[in-house]
Amino acid sequence: MIAIAYTLSFCFLGAQMIRWLMPQKSPLVRVWLGVSLGVLMEMGLPALCANALDFTVAAHIAAVAAALLLAAVCYAAREKAPLCAMRETDRRQLAVMAAVGIPLTALSAYLQYTHNIMPAADGSLWCGQATYGDLCMHLSFVTSLKNMRFPPSYSLLAGTSLAYPYLTDALSTTFYMFGMPLNLSLVVPGTLLMALTYAGYMLLAQQLLGGRHKAVTVAALLFFLNGGLGFLYDFDLAFTDNFARIREIFTGYYRTPANQPDLNLRFSNVIADLMIPQRALLGGWAMGIPALYLLISSAREKSYRQTALLALWASALPLVHTHTFLALGLFSGGYLLGNLVEHRQDRRGILIRAGLYLGAVSYTHLRAHETRSNL
């Protein structure tokens, strides 16, 4: 219960900060960005404070104080514009997000529960095929980060710095420290991050596609329910073998419609093979999509507030998921060149905002590297 209340407090602060900084965004975008910002602060601020207080309850209390300070800064820098109300296009977008996102989130909650040390009636513990390998590593991070001195080290190799983007696992450690069972410490934040990913993908698609809500729906379904045409091999002549190949989908080891090594078919489903087992990637997508949204929005609206928020957001990504940070960097470079070509009359403003963005991210990481070297 304490873990849930702690998370809700960060989400509330994040929603307020986005409300002050971007009041003219639609309510859907404000809520999604606000909750995402709250989760990002819950990931990063305790770890930041742990450099002085270790990853303890004291560091988590200090993280709340730091979040309140950031909220005060956002209030001081707030945009004094009327709050955007729900419009008809927002209601249609909400209907699309509910139709796609709610079933996917329910499926995700079930998969998170069944794939991450699910207790059985006889006392045994079970996991999924997809999580069988990764889960051991993530559990070691989640349990060992509790009360650990920072910067963190590998629990199985004393004295060796943890060279892994650990903030998603640190989020689970926070839940674990505040009394949540170990399996639910993976399930609850994992489900939350998956829900944010679904919502973020559809809002990003809306940003790019405009009011084409059917296209947003198709894009989301094609992305999250991918897998190729391997199912044809399972359902071809299914009646002749008493559905043996169909039963093997549920009982065979890594024999799925999307992944059939014997036939050299190796498609990976986004949900089953990436988001469920690869927790760093899950955190990276949940936090990387808002950064991408802010990048596009700040350029279109020529907003220095959004540029500053983007810079701080991007600065946290390497410890969430390094590949997401690299992808954001590549997209940022290409988007900068495209804007310079397309908006020649605003080249100076574009370069100033890009310089602030790049400078803030670079300075943050140079300072972090210098601090780490001195420890």
Predicted regions and their residues:
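Perimembrane helix-loop-helix junctions
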Residues: 295, 300-303, 327-359
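Membrane-interfacial entry segments at the cytosolic side of transmembrane helices
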Residues: 54-62, 86-96, 212-215, 344-357
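Transmembrane alpha-helical segments of multipass membrane enzymes and assembly factors
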Residues: 12-29, 51, 80, 200-217, ...
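Conserved small/polar residues in nucleotide/adenosyl-binding loops
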Residues: 364-371
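Membrane-embedded, hydrophobic transmembrane alpha-helices
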Residues: 1-94
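Active-site lumenal/periplasmic loops and adjacent helix-entry segments of GT-C-fold
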Residues: 104-287, 322-326
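Membrane-interface transmembrane helices that cradle and orient dolichyl/undecaprenyl
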Residues: 283-284, 288-305
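Membrane-interface alpha helices of multi-pass inner-membrane proteins
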Residues: 272-275, 306-321
